[in-house]
């Protein structure tokens, strides 16, 4: 599916992902570029991968012997630009659920320009929150390692904790210890470490601001 097709499919059901899709490349690129290409390119700054990782997307992979195999995207990346695709295999389908009512999803992309620019940092945070308690956390960060990564220790720390500023601050510090950013033309390692911290604050205060408006 082209990026335009993906945008049409998720516009109403996953508006957070639509916002990312809508600024991917240029209109010309979105008409011909595909989400499958973004996935198998295996770039640590790929825009679609953080979202797909926190949604536990499943990839259908076709091989030369006529039988598809299914693989969770979190098991697809083996290293920098390395995937689990075997010789003769191609990615044919990407399956992912829609966030449920009690799942809070935010997607972030930091770049020098809003449109038509390569990411300096990407992130996806999906928290299941019930009665102000975090029941589950899934967090994927891009441009802070050789692949987009799930910060598993941070996810485990958040489970069962109250959804509070202090808890999210502590989670940000834990996440910093799980990433290994480099310095390049788009940003320094220190800048990316700070972005990791900031994204947890941003997620929290987005929710508090929205709750205040409703009240």
Predicted regions and their residues:
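C-terminal structural segment of proteins
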Residues: 1-215
